[in-house]
C-alpha cells in the first residue's frame, strides 16, 4: 500500500516534467537549463531521460491509478521563464558588423606594418636614406630657427640697452632738476628768513618811531594846551582891562594916555570872539581819533601855524597892556604877573 502512492507520485513528477518539456514557451531554451531545472525539482537522471524521451515522442503514459481513478491535478511547479527568442538580423546589423570588422582589420594592419614588420624585416637602403634626409632637413630647420632666435635676441638686447641708456640719462636729468629745485628752495627759504628778519626789524623800528613820535606829539600837544590856556587867559584879562579904559571920561583918558596912545587915537581891536576858539576837549578828541602819520603831522603843523597867525592878530595895545603900558591896566597886569598861567578859564570850559 505504501509503495503504490510513492510510485504514483514519481509517475506524476515524470508526467509533469514531460509537460514542462513540451511547453512552447520554453521550447527555445537550452537543454542544460531544462535538465538543471528538473534536477532542482527532485527528479533522478533516469526519470529525466525518460521524460526527455517521452517529450521527443510526444506521448504521455498515464499511470494505472490515473486510468482507474482520476485524481485532482496537482499545481504546476514553479520554473524559470525561458529567454525571449533572438530577434531577426537585418541589413543594419550586417553593416555594423562589416564596419567594425574593417576598422579592426585596418588597425591590426597598421600595427603590424609599423611595429611588427620593421622588427622582423630590416629597412631598405632607400628608407634609410629618406630617414637620413628627413633628419638632416629637420636639423637644418632647427639650426635656422636657432640662428633667427639668436638674431632676435641680439636685436632685443640692443633695444633694451638703448632704452636703459635713455632711462639713465632721463634719471640723471631728473636728479639734476631735483637738486636745482632743492637749491632754489633753500635759497628761497633763506631769502624768506632774511625778509622776515628785515620785516621784523622794520616793524620794530616803525613801532619805536611811532612811539617816539607819539611821545613828541603828546609833548607838543601839552605845550599847545598850555599856550592855548595862556592865550585864553590873556584874552580874558585883556577884555577886562579894556572895559574900564573905555568908561573913563575924555579928560582923564587924554591926561593918562601915553604919547604912543596919542599918536594912535583910534585902534581897530581885531579880537576874535570866544566862540570861534575851539575848546580843549574838541582838540583832544580830534587828536585821539586821528592816527599818527604824515597827514596828522602836516595837519598839526598847519594848526600850529594858524595858532601863530591868531597870536599875531592880537593888537599891540593888548600886548602892551600885558606888559603894563597904561595906568588903567597896570593893576591887572600886576595881577597877571603875580598869577601867571592859572589854567583854562571857566568860560572856556563852559564853551
Swiss-Prot record:
InterPro entries according to UniProt? PEX14, Pex14_N, WH-like_DNA-bd_sf
Bias-annotated ranges (Basic and acidic residues):
283-293
Where does it live in the cell? Peroxisome membrane
* Subunit details: Interacts with PEX13 (via SH3 domain); forming the PEX13-PEX14 docking complex. Interacts with PEX5 (via WxxxF/Y motifs).
Q: Which organism is it from?
A: Pichia angusta
The protein's name is Peroxisomal membrane protein PEX14
Query: In its keyword annotation, does this UniProt entry include S-adenosyl-L-methionine?
Result: no
**Origin, by domain of life?**
Eukaryota
Q: Which UniProt keywords apply?
A: Membrane, Peroxisome, Protein transport, Translocation, Transport
Q: What role does this protein play? A: Component of the PEX13-PEX14 docking complex, a translocon channel that specifically mediates the import of peroxisomal cargo proteins bound to PEX5 receptor. The PEX13-PEX14 docking complex forms a large import pore which can be opened to a diameter of about 9 nm. Mechanistically, PEX5 receptor along with cargo proteins associates with the PEX14 subunit of the PEX13-PEX14 docking complex in the cytosol, leading to the insertion of the receptor into the organelle membrane with the concomitant translocation of the cargo into the peroxisome matrix.
**Has keyword Transport?**
yes
Q: Which spans does this entry mark as compositional bias, Polar residues?
A: 245-258, 294-303
An example Gene Ontology biological process: protein import into peroxisome matrix, docking
A matching Pfam family: Pex14_N
Region Disordered: which residues?
54-75, 243-351
Task: Summarize the record's disruption phenotype note.
Answer: Cells show an absence of normal peroxisomes.
Q: Name one GO molecular function term.
A: signaling receptor binding
Per the record, the similarity remark reads: Belongs to the peroxin-14 family.
- The primary location reported for this protein is membrane
> What are the GO cellular component annotations?
peroxisomal importomer complex; peroxisomal membrane
How would you describe this protein's topology in the membrane?
Peripheral membrane protein
Compositional bias ranges of the Low complexity kind: 60-70, 320-334
- Gene name linked to the record: PEX14
**Where is the motif SH3-binding annotated in this sequence?**
83-91
Amino acid at each position: 500500500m505504501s509503495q503504490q502512492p510513492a510510485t504514483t507520485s514519481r509517475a506524476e513528477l515524470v508526467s509533469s516534467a514531460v509537460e514542462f518539456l513540451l511547453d512552447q514557451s520554453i521550447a527555445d531554451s537550452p537543454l542544460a537549463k531544462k535538465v538543471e531545472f528538473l534536477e532542482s525539482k527532485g527528479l533522478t537522471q533516469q526519470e529525466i531521460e525518460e521524460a526527455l524521451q517521452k517529450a521527443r515522442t510526444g506521448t504521455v503514459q498515464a499511470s494505472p491509478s490515473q486510468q482507474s481513478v482520476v485524481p485532482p491535478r496537482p499545481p504546476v511547479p514553479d520554473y524559470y521563464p525561458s529567454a525571449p527568442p533572438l530577434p531577426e538580423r537585418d541589413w543594419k546589423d550586417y553593416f555594423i558588423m562589416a564596419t567594425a570588422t574593417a576598422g579592426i582589420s585596418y588597425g591590426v594592419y597598421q600595427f603590424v606594418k609599423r611595429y611588427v614588420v620593421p622588427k622582423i624585416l630590416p629597412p631598405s637602403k632607400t628608407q634609410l636614406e629618406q630617414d637620413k634626409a628627413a633628419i638632416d632637413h629637420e636639423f637644418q630647420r632647427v639650426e635656422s630657427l636657432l640662428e633667427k632666435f639668436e638674431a632676435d635676441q641680439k636685436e632685443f638686447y640692443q633695444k633694451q640697452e638703448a632704452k636703459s641708456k635713455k632711462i639713465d640719462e632721463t634719471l640723471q636729468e631728473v636728479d639734476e632738476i631735483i637738486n636745482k629745485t632743492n637749491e632754489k628752495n633753500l635759497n628761497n627759504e633763506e631769502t624768506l628768513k632774511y625778509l622776515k628778519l628785515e620785516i621784523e626789524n622794520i616793524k620794530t623800528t616803525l613801532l619805536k618811531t611811532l612811539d617816539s613820535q607819539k611821545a613828541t606829539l603828546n609833548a607838543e600837544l601839552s605845550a599847545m594846551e598850555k599856550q592855548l590856556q595862556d592865550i585864553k587867559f590873556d584874552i580874558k584879562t585883556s577884555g577886562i582891562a579894556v572895559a574900564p579904559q573905555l568908561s573913563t571920561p575924555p579928560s582923564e583918558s587924554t591926561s593918562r594916555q601915553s604919547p604912543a596912545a596919542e599918536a594912535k587915537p583910534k585902534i581897530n581891536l581885531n579880537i576874535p570872539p570866544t566862540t570861534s576858539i575851539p575848546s580843549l576837549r574838541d582838540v583832544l578828541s580830534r587828536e585821539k581819533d586821528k592816527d599818527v602819520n604824515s597827514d596828522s603831522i602836516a595837519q598839526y603843523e598847519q594848526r600850529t601855524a594858524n595858532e601863530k597867525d591868531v597870536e599875531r592878530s592880537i593888537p599891540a595895545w593888548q600886548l602892551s597892556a600885558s606888559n603894563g603900558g597904561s595906568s588903567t591896566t597896570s593893576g591887572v597886569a600886576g595881577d597877571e604877573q603875580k598869577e601867571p598861567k592859572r589854567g583854562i578859564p571857566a568860560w572856556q570850559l563852559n564853551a
